[in-house]
Every structure is written in C-alpha cells, then in structure tokens.
Curated annotation (Swiss-Prot):
Catalytic activity, as annotated: AMP + diphosphate = 5-phospho-alpha-D-ribose 1-diphosphate + adenine
GO CC terms, sorted: cytoplasm
Official protein name in the record: Adenine phosphoribosyltransferase
Pathways involved: Purine metabolism; AMP biosynthesis via salvage pathway; AMP from adenine: step 1/1
Entry EC no(s): 2.4.2.7
Protein family membership: Belongs to the purine/pyrimidine phosphoribosyltransferase family.
Pfam families (alphabetical): Pribosyltran
PANTHER family per the UniProt record, alphabetical: ADENINE PHOSPHORIBOSYLTRANSFERASE
Record organism: Vibrio vulnificus (strain YJ016)
GO MF entries: adenine binding; adenine phosphoribosyltransferase activity; AMP binding
SUBUNIT field: Homodimer.
Keywords: Cytoplasm, Glycosyltransferase, Purine salvage, Transferase
Length: 181
C-alpha cells in the first residue's frame, strides 16, 4: 500500500472536539466505515502485513475491534474470537479486570475459544492507554495462546499505550497516528 492509501484512510477518520467530554478530541472511526474504499484499504493493509505470519486466530475487542478483526480473520482464513464485556458471551468464560481513568472495567473470553499454542493476533480500532489490550493479552495467555502482535487502525502515541504494550512483549502496529488525547 502506498502513502496515498494511508493518507486516504487517515483523512476518512473524523475528529470530533469535546466528545465525550470537554478537552477530548475524539477520533471517530465510524466515518472510516462509511467510506467503502477506505474501509477496504484498511482491511487490505492489515491482510498484507499479517498474511504470512501463521496466525491461527484473530481476537477483536468489544466493540469496534470486531469491525476490523472479523473481516481480517476471514481474509486470513482463520477464526475470529470476540472479547466482550461481562455477561455478553453465552458459554463458559474467564475474566480480566483493568483500570480505567475513573474506575475499573472487565473483559471476558470463552474458555474454549483459544487452545494451547494458538498463535493470536489482537486487533482493535484505537490504541490509547493500552489497558483493554493488556487485559485481552492476559486472557489469551491464560488460555495458553501465544500473542506477540497487536494491530490498530489508530494510535495516539502521546498517551503511551504503545510503550505499555511493548512492555508486555507485543509488537504494535498502527495504520495511522494522531496527536492528542
């Protein structure tokens, strides 16, 4: 993919000031989804990057990680595993809590979704603090999966999530970077 393709993807992401609260510049990935060419280019970029790496599963985090992880898994010919908030998955699950700016949240994964030795790619729309992906990585590893890569459409490097995830041994890839919070 060319620099023009990445520029097209980045340009398709709208920035919404003071959402969800004053002082935040929200990066709205749903505007990318509305642009079929940008959405397709995003998935193709991820396919091109990860197609020969031997992944057996793609894990996407609730909810926007599903929008990029599921089509990527299909293109890679591997299964897709959702990581969700508590009470949303019907089979047996394990849970991992993580800290938010003002509180704690929890994620769950089906206990039979990852088998020992699965090589897993984690996908989400945006990397900020890295808390969601840290919790997701812990869940995958608890089930015996091998996770060394995390892919994002957007990274906000000033927040430091990429460094946090690298500290967990993850190779972090993002298509676009934006300044700010």
């Amino acid at each position: 993919m060319t620099t023009n393709t990445i520029a097209q993807i980045q340009a398709s992401i709208k920035s919404i000031p003071d959402y969800p609260k004053p002082g935040i510049l929200f990066r709205d990935v749903t505007s990318l989804l509305e642009d079929a060419q940008a959405y397709q280019a995003t998935i193709q970029l991820l396919v091109d990057k990860y197609k020969d790496m031997g992944f057996t599963k793609v894990v996407g985090t609730e909810a926007r990680g599903f929008l990029f992880g599921a089509p990527l898994a299909l293109q890679l010919g591997v299964g897709f595993v959702p990581v969700r908030k508590p009470g949303k998955l019907p089979r047996n699950t394990i849970a991992q809590s993580y800290e938010l700016e003002y509180g704690v949240d929890t994620l769950e994964i089906h206990t039979d979704a990852i088998v020992e030795g699965d090589k897993v790619l984690v996908v989400d729309d945006l990397l900020a603090t890295g808390g969601t992906i840290e919790a997701t990585t812990k869940l995958i590893r608890q089930l015996g999966g091998v996770v060394e890569h995390a892919a994002f459409v957007i990274n906000l490097p000033e927040i430091g999530g990429d460094k946090r995830l690298e500290g967990l041994g993850l190779n972090v890839y993002s298509i676009c970077e934006f300044e700010g919070h």
